[in-house]
């Protein structure tokens, strides 16, 4: 591993096709364990050079690479590259593992040096944000800022996200019911319907999100039904998917005994009861069966931005 924390990879400079293990945790580059890879995949090196945290560049690279089937990237991340010395070290590592270079370098001198270095190495050098920034500049008729890491400035939005995160943690799993009126949205659903991760993701977007579990034999907190101006969203999923998730949860806890928690009939009754509650209260419903946490959060944000009528967002 180099000084910038490059990912583990095949031998430097190679684009290889190799059999993958049966364990998806081991076989996916970057630890993407949510989808099974093809039995054979092509690996390639992608170098991400940033003068800031690298988060924007990393997200863009992953989004682009996801569009190619059977091709898995080996990421090499070079963050906080703000001097010629740091750039030279990055170029040394890039030379040892030929591939694609993407960057979000702002400083003109460093950009030129990186592009020249890649030209000598005969590697593509992509300024990831340039097309979008140029188009925005032309449309707005505004000059482009050269301030490094401008998106990470300590603005009011930053502190709003911190407060939203604190709120989500304090109001997870039905806690803090006394001040649910402070929530922008409350997610309601049976156990293992991604309520907590969705709330955390929403918090990173500055949304104050609480969640309330629906537990068989236990009525929801009465405060939930007294709210007038807070968006409440019901989360549901298919019985088969819910049983699978719950069984995996029990296995992780080394709990093997059968119970209503994973009983097919009991799970179906839980979901039916949840649906009936949502219908009675006229709460919008999101089916998370085929949705990632990010997609569920996006659907919630759409509901926050638009109407709050009786809507069901299908998976």
UniProtKB/Swiss-Prot annotation:
One Gene Ontology term of the molecular function aspect: ADP binding
Protein residues bound to ADP: 189-196
Keywords of this entry: Kinase, Nucleotide-binding, Serine/threonine-protein kinase, Transferase
Main EC class the enzyme belongs to: transferase
Record InterPro entries: Kinase-pyrophosphorylase, PPDK_reg
EC number: 2.7.11.32, 2.7.4.27
Region (Disordered): 1-32
Catalytic activity: N(tele)-phospho-L-histidyl/L-threonyl-[pyruvate, phosphate dikinase] + ADP = N(tele)-phospho-L-histidyl/O-phospho-L-threonyl-[pyruvate, phosphate dikinase] + AMP + H(+); N(tele)-phospho-L-histidyl/O-phospho-L-threonyl-[pyruvate, phosphate dikinase] + phosphate + H(+) = N(tele)-phospho-L-histidyl/L-threonyl-[pyruvate, phosphate dikinase] + diphosphate
Highest taxon listed in the record's lineage: Bacteria
Function: Bifunctional serine/threonine kinase and phosphorylase involved in the regulation of the pyruvate, phosphate dikinase (PPDK) by catalyzing its phosphorylation/dephosphorylation.
Family: Belongs to the pyruvate, phosphate/water dikinase regulatory protein family. PDRP subfamily.
NCBIfam families given in the database record: PRK05339.1 (NF003742)
Record's protein name: Putative pyruvate, phosphate dikinase regulatory protein
Naturally occurring in which organism (per UniProt): Caulobacter vibrioides (strain ATCC 19089 / CIP 103742 / CB 15) (Caulobacter crescentus)
């Amino acid at each position: 591993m180099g000084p910038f924390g490059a990912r583990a990879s095949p031998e430097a400079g190679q684009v290889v096709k190799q059999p993958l293990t049966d364990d998806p945790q081991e076989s996916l580059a970057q630890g993407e364990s949510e989808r099974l890879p093809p039995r054979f995949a092509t690996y390639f090196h992608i170098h991400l050079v940033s003068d800031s945290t690298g988060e924007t560049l990393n997200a863009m690279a992953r989004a682009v690479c996801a569009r190619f089937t059977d091709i898995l990237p080996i990421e090499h991340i070079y963050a906080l590259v703000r001097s010629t010395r740091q750039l030279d070290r990055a170029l040394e590592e890039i030379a040892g593992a030929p591939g694609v270079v993407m960057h979000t370098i702002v400083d003109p001198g460093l950009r030129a040096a990186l592009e020249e270095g890649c030209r000598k190495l005969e590697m593509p050098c992509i300024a990831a944000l340039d097309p979008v920034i140029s188009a925005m500049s032309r449309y707005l008729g505004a000059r482009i800022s050269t301030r490094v890491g401008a998106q990470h400035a300590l603005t009011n939005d930053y502190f709003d996200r911190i407060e939203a995160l604190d709120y989500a943690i304090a109001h997870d799993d039905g806690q803090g019911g006394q001040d649910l009126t402070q929530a922008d949205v409350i997610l309601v659903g049976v156990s293992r319907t991604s309520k907590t991760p969705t709330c955390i993701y929403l918090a990173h977007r500055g949304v104050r999100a609480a969640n309330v579990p629906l537990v068989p034999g236990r009525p929801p907190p009465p405060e939930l039904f007294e709210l007038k101006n807070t968006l409440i969203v019901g989360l549901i999923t298919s019985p088969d998917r819910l049983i699978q998730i719950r069984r995996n949860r029990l296995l992780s806890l080394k709990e093997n005994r059968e119970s209503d928690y994973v009983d097919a009939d009991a799970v179906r009754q839980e979901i039916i009861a949840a649906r009936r509650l949502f219908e009675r209260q006229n709460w919008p419903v999101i089916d998370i069966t085929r949705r990632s946490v990010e997609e569920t959060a996006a659907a919630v944000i759409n509901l926050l931005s638009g109407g709050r009528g009786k809507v069901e967002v299908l998976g």
